[in-house]
């Protein structure tokens, strides 16, 4: 693909040049080619976007629920009509295989938007009778202008996960995509405008997180920030949001999730789940089950089943429909993953497979890392304690149920957890003791629109998807009504 035209900001229903004068480049990580130069939003651009959003939000909130629902449903239709085009752009920008982006990223994002479009008419308050002449009723009102700050691994899906409930509740959103993968969020803005969203209700500000993101989190005109990213960045976002104007926050942060295989499990099923929990999207999924616990007596058999499945991984041309494994999102990220792999070797973990970059035709110019499995891992190892966010699985053994529950919970993270077992009683008994916000039994990874997702501990605050997320983009107003004559004591 030839280099794209310079990408601008999207404010008030159209493209506009950044006033900052700064730009950055986004690359195709499969081959290192520059895709586009992108303008970076500065402080004045954030001010412009907030003013635009404030204007648009008043128009949007004044529409009826059915009017808002119809506009969002039109956006869903356009997303599905343009699925292949958007998936190709997502593949170029992220490096993910087209077989994945064309069937998951846009598809699931559109599903979430459709879900919230259907919920809009059901967003209602309540009536509370107090006595014969006195009652209270409540209204759920939009917050106003909210900000979404996205991560680089699921660019358009995250933009939809954040914008869908925010817009459904009558808010306007200013979205800052990751500077690593900024392209499809701009296309989403076009689609919202085409669907009939009032100007300013969805603005997109590409830029560097340390600058543009900080301007958004500190801006007094922003009522809430929804952030997806790492724990360290999340803490800064939360601190800035609180210090500036006590903004509400939703945080979807990192994970180091346990996948527990019990001795009664079908090991073929367990191996299939472990593969999806570690190598889907080349391991760049926040919920990945990178700590795989297996009974000591099953270790050798499980290792062989994993190795057999690693042989089925097909890395290569990301637009080949048979390819199911792409490069990492960037060269700096690749280098960071390689540092973790080196640390694992240094600390005594045994490399079962992988452990280096992929080499050969088609790989040498890209950010490729081989699918890597470490065995003989210990809980104190760096690769077991810290989030790697790459195709690196750590195998650990255990002897008892109580032991594995304790070790699974021995982490600052609490995003996800899963177990594989044939015993239904054990399944629920163990899941109820795991300290994680998203749990799977005999499966892994699916996050439908109806399912609230989010973390315990350092893995986040609040939830995305589900009914409760729609409510989190509203504020409750209580109105007390007295129908009898008011009695004053004065």
Curated annotation (Swiss-Prot):
UniProt binding sites for K(+) 2: 246, 457, 460
Pathway terms, separated by semicolons: Amine and polyamine biosynthesis; betaine biosynthesis via choline pathway; betaine from betaine aldehyde: step 1/1
Residues under site feature: Seems to be a necessary countercharge to the potassium cations: 248
Family annotation (InterPro entries): Ald_DH/histidinol_DH, Ald_DH_C, Ald_DH_CS_CYS, Ald_DH_CS_GLU, Ald_DH_N, Aldehyde_DH_dom, BADH
EC number of the protein: 1.2.1.8
Known cofactor(s): K(+)
Keywords of the record: Metal-binding, NAD, NADP, Oxidation, Oxidoreductase, Potassium
Transmembrane region(s): none
Active-site residues, as the UniProt record annotates them: 162 (charge relay system), 252 (proton acceptor), 286 (nucleophile), 464 (charge relay system)
GO-annotated molecular function: betaine-aldehyde dehydrogenase (NAD+) activity; metal ion binding
Record-linked Gene3D superfamilies: Aldehyde Dehydrogenase, Chain A, domain 1, Aldehyde Dehydrogenase, Chain A, domain 2
Assembly behavior: Dimer of dimers.
Family statement: Belongs to the aldehyde dehydrogenase family.
PANTHER family referenced in this protein's UniProt entry, alphabetically: ALDEHYDE DEHYDROGENASE-RELATED
Role, per record: Involved in the biosynthesis of the osmoprotectant glycine betaine. Catalyzes the irreversible oxidation of betaine aldehyde to the corresponding acid.
HAMAP family on file: BADH (MF_00804)
Official protein name in the record: Betaine aldehyde dehydrogenase
Organism per entry: Escherichia coli (strain SE11)
Gene name of this polypeptide: betB
């Amino acid at each position: 693909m030839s280099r794209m035209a310079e990408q601008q900001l999207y404010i008030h229903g159209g493209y506009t040049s950044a006033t900052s004068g700064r730009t950055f480049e986004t690359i195709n990580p499969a081959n290192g080619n520059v895709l586009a130069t992108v303008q970076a939003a500065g402080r004045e651009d954030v001010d412009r976007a907030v003013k635009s959003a404030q204007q648009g939000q008043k128009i949007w909130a004044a529409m009826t629920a059915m009017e808002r629902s119809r506009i969002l449903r039109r956006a869903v239709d356009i997303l599905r009509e343009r699925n292949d085009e958007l998936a190709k752009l997502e593949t170029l920008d992220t490096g993910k295989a087209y077989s994945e982006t064309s069937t998951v990223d846009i598809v699931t994002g559109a599903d979430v938007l459709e879900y919230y479009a259907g919920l809009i008419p059901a967003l209602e308050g309540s009536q509370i009778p107090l006595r014969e002449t006195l009652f209270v009723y409540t209204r759920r009102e939009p917050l106003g202008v909210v900000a979404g700050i996205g991560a680089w691994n699921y660019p358009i899906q995250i933009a939809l996960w954040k914008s869908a409930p925010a817009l459904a509740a009558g808010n306007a959103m200013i979205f800052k995509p990751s500077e690593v993968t900024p392209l499809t969020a701009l296309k989403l803005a076009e689609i919202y405008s085409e669907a009939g969203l009032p100007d300013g209700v969805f603005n997109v500000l590409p830029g560097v997180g340390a600058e543009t993101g900080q301007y958004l989190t500190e801006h007094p005109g922003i009522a809430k920030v929804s952030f997806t990213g790492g724990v360290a960045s999340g803490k800064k976002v939360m601190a800035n949001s609180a210090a500036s104007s006590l903004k509400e926050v939703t945080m979807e942060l990192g994970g180091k999730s346990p996948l527990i295989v019990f001795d009664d499990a079908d090991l073929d099923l367990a191996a299939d789940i472990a593969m999806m929990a570690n190598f889907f999207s080349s391991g760049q999924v926040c919920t990945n089950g990178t700590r795989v616990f297996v009974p000591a007596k099953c270790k050798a058999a499980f290792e062989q089943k994993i190795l057999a499945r690693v042989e089925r991984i097909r890395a290569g041309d990301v637009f080949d429909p048979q390819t199911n494994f792409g490069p990492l999102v960037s060269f700096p990220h690749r280098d960071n993953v390689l540092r973790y792999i080196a640390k694992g070797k240094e600390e005594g973990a045994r490399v079962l497979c992988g452990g280096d970059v992929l080499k050969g035709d088609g790989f040498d110019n890209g950010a490729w890392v081989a699918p890597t499995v470490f065995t003989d891992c210990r809980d104190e190892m760096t690769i077991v304690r810290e989030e790697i966010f790459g195709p690196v699985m750590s195998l650990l053994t255990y002897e008892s149920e109580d032991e594995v529950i304790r070790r699974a919970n021995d982490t600052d993270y609490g995003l996800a957890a899963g177990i594989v077992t044939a015993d239904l009683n054990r399944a629920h008994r163990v899941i109820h003791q795991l300290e994680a916000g998203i749990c799977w039994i005999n499966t892994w990874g699916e996050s439908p629109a109806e399912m609230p997702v989010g973390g315990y501990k350092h893995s986040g605050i609040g939830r995305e998807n589900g009914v409760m997320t729609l409510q989190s983009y509203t504020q409750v107003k209580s109105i007390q009504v007295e129908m009898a004559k008011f009695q004053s004591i004065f």
